[in-house]
């Protein structure tokens, strides 16, 4: 045992020496310029722009592959993906705290975009790989940790809003472009273009994105072990449960994002099937909603955070979400969908405000763990939400019986015949369920305190997060973080 320990110490000293030499010599190129929010923004934009191009083609392939149970199978596929994301997010977040953000940005983007070229090669493999890619579908987790590394606490809500707005911006034009190119040139060209954009995103990370995690925040050795407790999402949630305020935030995220995830997965089908929207109308709807979301998550979010504070901004966003879901649930006319879309854009301020609040619960070297935990909850919702919505559509006999397709032409609007009549009391039953879920989230969020006891919050969180901290992690003097969940104005 003694000889083994000596060998281990010698190996650690060798690693430390190699690391010092690399640092002294400047190491390998780490990207273009200093780490900035704009690096994260470009990564997010390219990834989701590539997937946005496939909005219309995916509907066609989904219906052709599962003609009898389109809504239900869509929910199950997204459910498996979301469950795997939930299981893997804490581990990837913790590993990024140790090994840096750049390598995991590369990993998550690569595997998230891996299914794209398979759409035309083999639809069955396409949907299978989509399900399995959930293991690495945690780009937002790493991106938010990247942003937290390079911003001060008072800057984070604006930075998170910019990232979320970029996600919305990627959906402003990409579905319309994808639908147009598919109609004129065929869906194969759309798949090739989406694949090229995904490759561009990967190359951008390799060449241009610098590492954001400061060297002093990493463990002293490269071979730092990751405990199974860090890799276990349920253990992470149990530890969070020891802190009542963090638990309230997690419950709020779960109850509010569960219907949102279901809405994302089925809303395009709903507009086409029930509201009789044409492909052009759907693309225009997505574009308008995206533009309004960008305005809400940048200008409006900044003003609200400055004027009413972090918690009240979350409550307001939840209120808008309840209104838009109820409107979609009872709405039976196209103009109601457009009006509810404007309200839905305002509700998009909720998650960046929650992310800003959550970021205050962790030290600089714990941002990946905390954001990974929240992304894990969202990943679980990404599994449960689509499956739940698909099941509710199924039991209410809402199914995609006919899709207006002429070859690869998605522009012809042929009204599908369906036995779900427009005179139903509740045209959109899953959305009404979602409104009830968000109402519960709002009631839970009311118990999140405006201000917290500084000394108690700090010591309590350090005690609970102690097992996540690596023994070699250091923090420079004078870098003490502000207490947890202190509701300061931006």
Swiss-Prot record:
One of its GO terms (molecular function) is transmembrane transporter activity. The keyword Translocase does not apply. Keywords: Acetylation, Glycoprotein, Membrane, Transmembrane, Transmembrane helix, Transport. It comes from Mus musculus (Mouse). The modification N-acetylmethionine is found at residue 1. It is found in: Membrane. The gene is Mfsd14a. InterPro entries: MFS, MFS_dom, MFS_trans_sf, Sugar_transporter_CS, Tet-R_TetA/multi-R_MdtG-like. This is Hippocampus abundant transcript 1 protein. GO terms for biological process: acrosome assembly; sperm mitochondrion organization; spermatid development; spermatid nucleus differentiation; spermatogenesis. Expressed in various tissues. Residues 466-490 are annotated as: Disordered. Disulfide bonds: none annotated. It holds the Pfam family MFS_1. Glycans are attached at residues 12, 453. It is a multi-pass membrane protein. Belongs to the major facilitator superfamily. GO terms for cellular component: membrane. Residues 62-74, 125-126, 182-188, 265-284, 335-337, 401-427 are cytoplasmic.
């Amino acid at each position: 045992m003694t000889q083994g320990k000596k060998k281990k110490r010698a190996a650690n000293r060798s690693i430390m020496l190699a690391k010092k030499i690399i640092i002294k010599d400047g190491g390998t190129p780490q990207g273009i310029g200093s780490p900035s929010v704009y690096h994260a923004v470009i990564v997010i934009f390219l990834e989701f722009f590539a997937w946005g191009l496939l909005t219309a083609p995916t509907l066609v392939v989904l219906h052709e592959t599962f003609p009898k149970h389109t809504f239900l199978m869509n929910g199950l596929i997204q459910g498996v993906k979301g469950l795997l994301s939930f299981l893997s997010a804490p581990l990837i977040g913790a590993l990024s705290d140790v090994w840096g953000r750049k390598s995991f940005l590369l990993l998550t983007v690569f595997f998230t975009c891996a299914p794209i070229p398979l759409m035309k090669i083999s639809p069955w493999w396409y949907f299978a790989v989509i399900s399995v890619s959930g293991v690495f579908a945690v780009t937002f987790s790493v991106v938010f940790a990247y942003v937290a590394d390079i911003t001060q606490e008072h800057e984070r809500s604006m930075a998170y809003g910019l990232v979320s707005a970029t996600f919305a911006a990627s959906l402003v034009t990409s579905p319309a472009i994808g639908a147009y190119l598919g109609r004129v040139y065929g869906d194969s060209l759309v798949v090739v273009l989406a694949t090229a954009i995904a490759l561009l995103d990967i190359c951008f990370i390799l060449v241009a994105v610098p590492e954001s995690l400061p060297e002093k925040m990493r463990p002293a050795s490269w071979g730092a072990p990751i405990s199974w407790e860090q890799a276990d999402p349920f253990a992470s949630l149990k530890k969070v449960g020891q802190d009542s305020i963090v638990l309230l935030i997690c419950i709020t995220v779960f109850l509010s994002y569960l219907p949102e995830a279901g809405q994302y997965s089925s809303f395009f089908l709903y507009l086409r099937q029930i509201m009789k929207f044409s492909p052009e109308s759907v693309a225009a709807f997505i574009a308008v909603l995206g533009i309004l979301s960008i305005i809400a998550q940048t200008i409006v979010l900044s003003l609200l955070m400055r004027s009413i504070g972090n918690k009240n901004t979350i409550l307001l966003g939840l209120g808008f979400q309840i209104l838009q879901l109820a409107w979609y649930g009872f709405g039976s006319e196209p103009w109601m969908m457009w009006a509810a879309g404007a309200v839905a854009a305002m509700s998009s301020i909720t998650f960046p405000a929650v992310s800003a609040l959550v970021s205050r619960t962790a030290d600089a070297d714990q941002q990946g763990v905390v954001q990974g935990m929240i992304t894990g909850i969202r990943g679980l919702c990404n599994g449960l939400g689509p499956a739940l919505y698909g099941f509710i559509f199924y039991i209410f006999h809402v199914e995609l019986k006919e899709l207006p397709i002429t070859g690869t032409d998605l522009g012809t609007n042929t009204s599908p015949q369906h036995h779900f009549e427009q005179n139903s009391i509740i045209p959109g039953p899953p959305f009404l369920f979602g409104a009830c879920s968000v109402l519960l989230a709002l009631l839970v969020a009311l118990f999140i305190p405006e201000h917290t006891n500084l000394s108690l919050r700090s010591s309590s969180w350090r005690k609970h997060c102690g097992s996540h901290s690596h023994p070699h992690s250091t923090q420079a003097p004078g870098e003490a973080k502000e207490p947890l969940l202190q509701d300061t104005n931006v």
